[in-house]
Amino acid sequence: MESIQIHDKQFVPFINRDKISRYVEFLANQIAEDIGPDEVPIFIGILNGSFMFAADFVRNYPNDCHITFVKMASYEGVNSTGKIKHLVGINEDLTGKTVVILEDIIDTGNTLAEIYEIFRDKKVKKLLIATLFFKPDVFRKELPIDYIGKSIEDKFIVGYGLDYDGLGRNLPDIYQLKL
């Protein structure tokens, strides 16, 4: 892995694809063990960032499951705007279902708070949150995160679905903003 440039920023190698695969496999197996083989959960990926994570996750999930997506956004450039844009909703009836949210990254918790707000009236059996990456230093909400692939520092990252102004999602590895 070599340093890369996206738009006007330099990024350095941070987490390679093999480690990412191990985090995803760990999460899929842990959630499958906790939910059990008789429950058919609905996994909900948060677009656009979680599309790679969600795809690899369900490939690793050993039991039956459903998957769908919702689109929300809180970033412009490398900074969180603090404002959530709820762009595409959920059409499935979630009443009495176990729902697992698949997030690419949780930092401030603003998107997570919006997720909890959306699901408050859905009458789900259980709502679980799984994130591939978590930035505990900037997390400001009193909300549970049930599964964490890896905790990282508060530095901007791209790759494996995460972007910088629309670019970098296709990278198979994770890169960190060079300061």
Where are the regions that the model predicts?
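PRPP-associated nucleotide enzymes
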Residues: 1-179
